[in-house]
Amino acid sequence: MKIDILTLFPEMFAPLEHSIVGKAKEKGLLDIHYHNFRDYAEKARHVDDEPYGGGQGMLLRAQPIFDTIEQIEAKKPRIILLDPAGKPFTQAYAEELALEEELIFICGHYEGYDERIKTLVTDEISLGDFVLTGGELAAMTIVDATVRLIPQVLGKESSHQDDSFSSGLLEYPQYTRPYDYRGMTVPDVLMSGHHERIRLWRLEESLRKTYLRRPDLLERYDFSEEERKLLDKIKEALGQGED
């Protein structure tokens, strides 16, 4: 995969080199470049200007963004604008982006964008209903979530398949040594060696956690008959079963 990031602050992305992104680069699975679009600004290196019609703040000018993207060698890239008004980013979105060969991210850092920039864009993405100072943190988050899904980046293919949200449910609780820590012990079922019992326990715990913390995920979840019965059992235990 090839990723190009347009930003006024390339140095902000240094931590990515020490994460899964760095490992992907070492394996030759990722080629990533950072472009300071101030270098392409024609008007005394100014990348922002006042909005026509008046208003608060400054807008990112179209010219530096157009010129930067036009010098990037890419065939059919997905061009992503980080914007609070964009489509919410999800695990499913990350899985979709991981199938692409080329991604370009545009990180803003002002009140907004000249609307004409959006004629270049294929995706407008938001991390949630809040506003960040710039798009860099959002871009780093999306890049990390996407790159780890590229085949062979993680040690085992199942590593990300068991993550929260990959299955549509939150991940079940996990434990490691010691068995007893300050009186808190590992559930006996995990010590049993009985694979089917462990599978059922993990599924039930995933359903329980999702029901209690993110019930909205269950509204669009495609339940198997087994999962539906387990959820009914959970609701009954909580005194919330159907009449």
UniProtKB/Swiss-Prot annotation:
Catalytic class of the enzyme: transferase
Places the protein is found: Cytoplasm
Enzyme Commission code: 2.1.1.228
Source superkingdom: Bacteria
One record GO biological process: tRNA N1-guanine methylation
Keywords assigned: Cytoplasm, Methyltransferase, S-adenosyl-L-methionine, Transferase, tRNA processing
Binding locations of S-adenosyl-L-methionine: 108, 127-132
GO cellular component annotations of the record: cytosol
GO molecular function, one term: tRNA (guanine(37)-N1)-methyltransferase activity
Family statement drawn from the similarity comment of this UniProt entry: Belongs to the RNA methyltransferase TrmD family.
The protein's role, per its UniProt record: Specifically methylates guanosine-37 in various tRNAs.
Subunit structure, interactors included: Homodimer.
Record protein name field: tRNA (guanine-N(1)-)-methyltransferase
